[in-house]
From Swiss-Prot:
It comes from Xenopus laevis. Its main location: nucleus. Residues 119-213 bind DNA. This is Forkhead box protein A4-B. The gene is foxa4-b. Transcriptional repressor involved in embryonic nervous system development. Plays a role in the induction and patterning of the anterior-posterior neural axis. Involved in the establishment of floor plate differentiation from neural plate cells during gastrulation. Binds the anf1 promoter sequence to restrict expression of anf1 to the anterior of the neural plate, thereby patterning the forebrain. Can bind to the HNF-3-alpha DNA target sequence. Cooperates with t/bra in a dose-dependent manner to specify dorsal mesoderm formation, including notochord. Residues 218-234 have a biased composition (Basic and acidic residues).
């Protein structure tokens, strides 16, 4: 910087005389003494000094001395950089990293398998099926199946004990494989395994990647149905289902003459009791429930004409409790001919309204009515009179 200023101003004055010695920067050869030994120094210092030679012409003495000092500095830095440079035989990577990379490539445990040694995308049932279907006799022993799998798929050459157990379980627990005993003509060890004749549609179009459906033998299905049918809970359910059918048969076999004879009775409750008691179903709780429930249902075993005839004769015996309650009852939606057979729909005993939804209690109530008859009505009227007589022992006007 000072040299350029001196050249531009063309001042022949010596700058060293204007400054003290401690105010002027020292030379470069004195600066290297304060640098650490392991500091980085550029290797192209000599090129810089050579490029600065054009300034040496016409320069005063101090500048030439500085240039000479730079030349000695370049030789010294070359020796320092040469001592720090790595040997030419080694690469740019650290020594330990190169050794680890070579060991990684030589390790057989980390060797990546190719596609031929990969696990095949087939289940054990698919492997067994393929082996049997490719056999000339369409049957193979267990050892032959093992050998066929090992020869075709190198993956199964390791850990043979594991997948061989899976093969045996697949043969035993699947209905699509049948065990065929050896014939006397072919002596040897182990029985043959073949496919079930009806298991040909397990796989879709010969693709063994996935089964279309699980094959189940029909014989095993029938055996399971018989075992389920022998359970004790099914016996009671079957008897309950048969009870309404037997009652319908009894009601259909009942003659109109018997209905007329029953209609001659005085009490309505006694006639109902006679109709239910005269049936061959019996007095068991199950039969009573079925009888009371069937009074509210349309008998499926009869035709419309026969049913209307029975209703016309027994209209005073069987009243529909839902007839006058809502417009969507079955009697409201039937034909007008059937509506004509109900002239006294609204004439129903109001005491049975709270017993409509309880069939057991309604049957007990009818039995109670049939036993007492009209005595219940007379007794109730007498008790009511006595009750009010006790309350009003004297006239009301006299109390005023």
């Amino acid at each position: 910087m000072l040299n350029r200023v001196k050249l531009e101003l063309k001042d022949p004055m010596d700058w060293n005389t204007m400054y003290q010695e401690n105010e002027i920067y020292s030379g470069i050869h004195n600066m290297t003494n304060g640098l650490p030994s392991n500091s980085f120094l550029p290797t192209d210092v000599p090129t810089v000094t050579s490029s600065m030679t054009y300034m040496s012409n016409g320069l005063p003495g101090p500048v030439a001395s500085i240039q000479g000092n730079l030349g000695s500095l370049g030789s010294m830095t070359q020796g320092m950089v040469g001592s720090l440079a790595p040997p030419p035989s080694t690469s740019a990577y650290p020594l330990g990293y190169c050794q680890g990379e070579s060991e990684f490539q030589r390790d057989p445990r980390t060797y990546r398998r190719n596609y031929s040694h990969a696990k095949p995308p087939y289940s054990y049932i698919s492997l067994i099926t393929m082996a049997i279907q490719q056999a000339p006799n369409k049957m193979m022993t267990l050892n032959e199946i093992y050998q066929w799998i090992v020869d075709l798929f190198p993956y199964y050459r390791q850990n043979q004990q594991r997948w061989q157990n899976s093969i045996r379980h697949s043969l035993s627990f699947n209905d699509c494989f049948i065990k065929v005993p050896r014939s006397p003509e072919k002596p040897g060890k182990g029985s043959y395994w073949t496919l079930h004749p009806e298991s040909g549609n397990m796989f879709e179009n010969g693709c063994y990647l996935r089964r279309q459906k699980r094959f189940k033998c029909e014989r095993s299905k029938s055996g399971e149905g018989e075992r389920k049918g022998n359970k004790p809970g099914d016996e009671t359910g079957g008897s309950l289902k048969e009870t309404p059918v037997s009652f319908d048969d009894c009601s259909s076999s009942r003659s109109p003459q018997a209905a007329v004879n029953d209609g001659g009775r005085d009490s309505t409750g006694s006639s109902i009791h006679q109709a239910t008691g005269g049936s061959p179903v019996g007095f068991s709780p199950t039969s009573e429930q079925a009888g009371t429930a069937s009074q509210l249902m349309y008998p499926l075993g009869l035709s419309n004409d026969g049913y209307l005839g029975l209703v016309g004769e027994d209209v005073h015996l069987k009243h529909d409790p839902f007839s006058g309650r809502h417009p969507f009852s079955i009697t409201q939606l039937m034909s007008s001919e059937q509506d004509q057979t109900y002239p006294n729909k609204m004439e129903m005993c109001p005491t049975t309204d709270h017993l409509v939804h309880y069939s057991n209690y309604s049957s007990d109530y009818h039995n109670l009515v049939s036993k007492n008859g009209l005595d219940m009505q007379t007794s109730s009227s007498s008790t009511d009179n006595g009750y009010y007589a006790n309350m009003y022992s004297r006239p009301i006007l006299s109390s005023l």
